[in-house]
From Swiss-Prot:
This is DNA-directed RNA polymerase subunit beta. Transmembrane segments: none annotated. It comes from the Eukaryota. Belongs to the RNA polymerase beta chain family. The gene is rpoB. GO terms for molecular function: DNA binding; DNA-directed RNA polymerase activity; ribonucleoside binding. Keywords: Chloroplast, DNA-directed RNA polymerase, Nucleotidyltransferase, Plastid, Transcription, Transferase. It catalyses: RNA(n) + a ribonucleoside 5'-triphosphate = RNA(n+1) + diphosphate.
Length: 1076
């Protein structure tokens, strides 16, 4: 957080800062921590010792560029060099050796793994430590339990039963006496009684037999092992038994870590040193003491709130990468031990590098990381839909993943908003559906304390003494456990000056409660009007007038907006658009001042301090979401520029600001039922003038392989049996030419796969060749890459990737231009979404009093029930801004200045626009914001005045071109023999229970029979029906049941229920008991 000289002013931190800070901590600290844990590998028989040292490790610059890594499907990584020492007899060798490659974060805060941009999102978990809770059993008796959570996520419970005996539950099934556990951890009975506050309770429950079991540590360990492992018989104490117990129990359930040790000391008022990160007998006894105090009413009856952020910690990218590095070093240790054994078998002299160099050992590090990025739930494909998604994705926090919650079992309480989220986690921005409340987004000013894993929020410190001494106020970052001790003034006091504030009573937050107190009692106050919202929520103007559910939809839908070919910044915004675009990395920013020498579509040449710098531009590059990423130069040749100036703009940015949609003229009125149920009526102007036209790039690839007979596949233009029309775009190598326009079913890459013909298929000449010369006749199968349905477009790039002579991959990139059409989804910034239902000629659209036709018609019934009135304020103010040629940037919650501030602003601007343009219809006092408009078909005015305005409308990525789908025949499910589900699998349309009811209601028995049998899972009938249809024969009526019925019968048989069916003839409708 940077502070200006102005009092009460602060700048917003970099939105991608959290990812960069996490990765820097991994490189600077975590690598050294894990290398320090690497044990010395000794082989006493041969007097050899190998060791790695953390001091002075080095990371080389990546050997390839980012763009090459993406195109060639490689990992953008850096080689790690570490100091190593090898003692072989009396020979000591020291060497700096390479132990493998580590993926490197790029300037977007992402990683490139096998050519794909991936990002690691932050995980929020219960912090290690101890948590107490009380609950009532079925008899209404209070049961008190204490849960100890380890750093690995393992749980142990302390509980007091009805007989007032204290147990430790180390798993769901086994419970062990607290005395046995303490003795097994190294305490004798005398030490236990000396270190507890209630020794009489500890002495009351062990009988003579139990006292014998805890006479010594060895007996206690045996007893503990028997109960923990459920082993009977006589056991003998041994070192292997101790090691097994250490591995299965103590390592998993007793390692608290640095954070757990701090939490345990705080909760139980202990003073155990921070470097002692394991659970000690003293911890267990203090935890038991506290539990006894809760049970008998002598302690504080305070249940721990598991959903409070002070009891949570963030596992950032640093923690997750550190775990994987530790895992890779463990594998490296085993690999080096095997290599040492092989060295002695071959009797060769080893060096530190030769112990690590074998191929399998040197790639251990990078394969571990590639597996992690490919399979770990918190490693996600980077969302590159638009600049907003690129900025927001790295700020996500998730409760899901290993050690966390699950979408199906999480309670409402764990999903709900908590008072401790204020200024840390956005109360609005979360996913819809099963994961609602489990994935969130960090507030714009929140930062992560990487040392303790807590989320901190900034506040201004208010102190009368400090204010007198110096005019500036200090910004303090408070963690969730600290802000409980402060009186925090709410954001509505921001507008008041110091003199007025001292006389006022202000609303404040204290210990999760809201109070009204005098200004003198305030300790800290908020620093920003919307510091408790995420980036998505902060981009919604007039958010305070919207229902929270609609604001949630809006913040999600802004991330689905497609970058348009001609972007336009919003008339009404919140002021955060510039920072969001800047931190997304899509624009090119000058890193130093200088003079522009030349610009073109690929690069900008800049002269600075006597040097010429070449700044590359992104030119029609495909994103992960198939959008077109393109940068356009914004500086002319010869212009002098300063550091920080925008040189080129990326997709969906204009003038350095985020520009996701278009300002279009909208009317809220019904129109012939075409905007029923959220449908949207649009003007053909939006199509012909390319208002909502977007470009998309599809990637198609094909790879050559070696067949089972050892023959290599071949890329060629010479493909027999194919029409010349399909091959018209191929060059002499058999690959489509750059710039070609391709249609569905055209060949993009010609490929032949050799096949050995079977003897029965030989023609006479082939048999003769084989008999005389012994030559095998081979045939080739055409396996070319063809353009699928809906893929038509222009070829903009072709890439050959050849790793060896036989392994060739060809990638073809095709650019598509998509205008807006019926079936596309559009949305505003207030959760007002809809599907295009009809594109009307502009002369038929309703028009204003000055003759301007409306661009979009929304249903007015979508506003009152959804309670998203912000769209009305936005559209009216947008109209005023369009007429006055103004842009507005309004912070939310402007009612803190005065009542009805939003309404007053909108009406005053409309009145000014009416005066300026001399158009009285812009602001009519009888119905402000509304106007009389005319039907374009008849020229008659509509009966009621209609609300008109300029709204910022987005085109979303849910486009009809990617949704529409048809199937004639295709794959069937193996079990039910019904068509599979989904567009990607060329699946069928499901006719469910309710659809069958509808067809039954119309009495269409034959259609129903076709849908449920012939077209679906009647195996014999569906083969014969095609032939019958072609030849005009009668459709056969088969008597055997469809496959799904047979599956049902088998299911019942597996439950020991026999189900038979009999055909009753038309003549005799009765079946006797004997026949059955």
């Amino acid at each position: 957080m940077l502070r200006n000289g102005n009092e009460g002013m602060s700048t917003i931190p970099g939105f991608s800062q959290i990812q960069f800070e996490g990765f820097c901590r991994f490189i600077n600290q975590a690598l050294a921590e894990e290398l320090n844990k690497f044990p010395a590998i000794k082989d006493p028989d041969h007097e050899i010792a190998f060791q790695l040292f953390a001091k002075g490790y080095q990371l080389l610059e990546p050997s390839i560029k980012e763009r090459d890594a993406v195109y060639e499907s490689l990992t953008y990584s850096s080689e790690l060099y570490v100091s190593a020492r090898l003692i072989f007899g009396f020979d000591v060798q020291k060497q700096t050796i390479s132990i493998g490659n580590i993926p490197i974060m790029n300037s977007l805060g992402t990683f490139i793994i096998n050519g794909i941009y991936r990002i690691v999102i932050n995980q929020i978990l219960l912090s290690p430590g101890i948590y107490y809770r009380s609950e009532l059993d079925h008899k209404g008796i209070s049961i008190y339990t204490g849960t100890i959570i380890s750093d690995w996520g393992g749980r142990s419970e302390l509980a007091i039963d009805k007989k007032e005996r204290i147990w430790a539950r180390v798993s769901r099934k086994q419970k062990i006496s607290i005395l046995v556990l303490s003795s097994a951890m190294g305490s004798n009975l005398r030490e236990i009684l000396d270190n507890v506050s209630y020794p009489e309770i500890f002495l009351s429950f062990p009988n003579a037999k139990e006292k014998k079991r805890i006479e010594s540590k060895e007996k206690a360990i045996l007893e503990f092992y028997q109960q923990f492992a459920c082993v009977g018989g006589d056991l003998v104490f041994s070192e292997s038994l101790c090691e097994e117990l250490q591995k299965k129990f103590f390592q998993q359930k007793c390692e608290l870590g640095r954070i757990g040790r701090r939490n345990m000391n705080r909760r139980l008022n202990l003073d155990i040193p921070q470097n002692n990160t394991f659970l000690l007998p003293r911890d267990v006894l203090a935890a038991t003491d506290h539990l006894i105090g809760m049970k008998f009413g002598t302690g504080i009856l305070d249940d721990d709130d598991m959903n409070h952020l002070k009891n949570k910690r963030i596992r950032s990218v640093a923690d997750l990468l550190q775990d994987q590095f530790g895992l890779a070093l463990g594998r490296l240790q085993h690999a080096v031990q095997k290599t040492i054994r092989r060295v002695f078998i071959r009797q060769s002299k080893p060096t530190p590098q030769t112990l690590v160099t074998p191929t399998s050992t040197s790639i251990l590090l990078i394969t571990t990381y590639e597996t992690f990025f490919g399979t770990y739930p918190l490693s996600q494909v980077f969302d590159q839909t638009n600049p907003l998604t690129q900025t927001v994705h790295g700020r996500k926090v998730s409760c899901l993943g290993p050690g966390g919650l699950t979408g199906r079992t999480s309670s409402f309480r764990s999903r709900d908003i908590h008072p401790s989220h204020y200024g840390r986690i956005c109360p609005i921005d979360t996913s819809e559906g099963i994961n609602v409340g489990l994935t969130g987004s960090l507030a714009i000013h929140a930062r992560i304390n990487h040392l303790w894993g807590s989320i901190e929020s900034p506040f201004y410190e208010i102190s009368a003494e400090k204010a007198k001494k110096k005019k500036s106020r200090q910004v303090v970052y408070l963690s969730p456990n600290r802000d409980e001790y402060y009186m925090i003034a709410a954001g509505n006091s921001l507008s008041l000056n110091q003199g007025i504030q001292e006389e006022q009573v202000v609303p404040a937050r204290y210990r999760q409660e809201f109070l009204t107190i005098a200004w003198e009692q305030i300790h800290v106050r908020s620093i920003f009007p919307f510091q408790y919202f995420s980036i998505g929520g902060s981009l919604i103007p007039f958010i305070e007038h919207n229902d929270a559910n609609r604001a949630l939809m809006s913040s999600n839908m802004q991330r689905q907006a497609v970058p348009l070919s001609r972007s336009e910044k919003c008339i009404v915004g919140t002021g955060l658009e510039r920072q969001t675009a800047l931190d997304s990395g899509v624009s090119v920013i000058a890193e130093r001042e200088g003079k522009i020498l030349s610009t073109d579509s690929h690069k900008i040449l800049l002269s600075s301090s006597g040097k010429t710098l070449s700044i590359p531009l992104v030119n029609h590059r495909r994103s992960n979401k198939n959008n077109c990423m393109h940068q356009k130069s914004r500086v002319p040749r010869g212009k002098s520029i300063k550091k920080g100036q925008i040189l080129a703009e990326g997709a969906a940015t204009v003038g350095g600001e985020l520009a996701l949609g278009k300002n279009v003229l909208v009317a809220y009125m019904p129109w012939e039922g075409y905007n029923f149920e959220d449908a949207v009526l649009i003007s053909e102007r939006l199509v012909y003038e390319d208002i909502y036209t977007s470009f998309h790039i599809r990637k198609y690839e094909i790879q050559t392989d070696t067949t089972s007979q050892g023959s290599a596949e071949k890329i060629t233009k010479e493909i027999p049996h194919l029409e010349a029309h399909l091959l018209r775009n191929l060059d002499r190598n058999g690959v489509v030419r750059l710039g070609s326009w391709v249609e569905t079913s055209d060949i993009l890459v010609g490929k032949l796969t050799p096949q050995i013909a079977s003897e029965s298929s030989y023609i006479a000449e082939a048999g003769l060749l084989r008999a005389i010369f012994g030559l095998e006749v081979s045939t080739s199968k055409e396996t070319s890459l063809k353009l699928p349905i809906g893929g038509r477009g222009r070829v903009i790039d072709v890439k050959w990737i050849q790793r060896d002579p036989l392994d060739i991959m060809v990638r073809v990139y095709i650019l598509q231009k998509r205008e807006i059409k019926v079936g596309d989804k559009v949305a505003g910034r207030h959760g007002n979404k809809g599907i295009i239902s009809k594109i009307l000629p502009r002369q038929d659209m309703p028009y204003l009093q000055d003759g301007t036709p409306v661009d979009m018609v929304f249903n007015p019934l979508g506003v009152p029930s959804r309670m998203n009135v912000g769209q009305i304020f936005e559209s009216s103010l947008g109209l005023a801004g369009d007429l006055l040629k103004k842009h507005y940037r309004i912070a939310p919650f402007d009612e803190r200045y005065e009542q009805e501030a939003s309404r007053k602003l909108v009406f005053s601007e409309l009145y000014e626009a009416s005066k300026e343009t001399k158009n009285p219809w812009v602001f009519e006092p009888e119905y402000p914001g509304k106007s009389r408009i005319f039907d374009g078909r008849t020229g008659d005015p509509f009966e009621q005045p209609v609300l008109i305005g300029k709204s910022y409308i987005l085109k979303l990525i849910h486009q009809v071109d990617e949704k529409i789908h048809g199937r004639s025949t295709g794959p069937y499910s193996l079990v039910t023999q019904q068509p599979v589900r989904g567009r990607a699998k060329q699946g069928g349309q499901r006719v469910g229970e309710m659809e069958v009811w509808a067809l039954e209601g119309f009495g269409v028995a034959h259609i129903l029979q076709e849908i449920l049998t012939y077209k679906s899972d009647h195996l014999i009938a569906r083969q014969e029906i095609l032939n019958a249809t072609i030849w005009g024969k009668r459709i056969p009526n088969h008597e055997d049941p469809p496959e799904s019925f047979r599956v049902l019968v088998r299911e019942l048989r597996s439950l020991a229920l026999e189900l038979n069916h009999f055909l009753v003839s038309e003549k005799n409708f009765q079946v006797t008991r004997e026949e059955v």
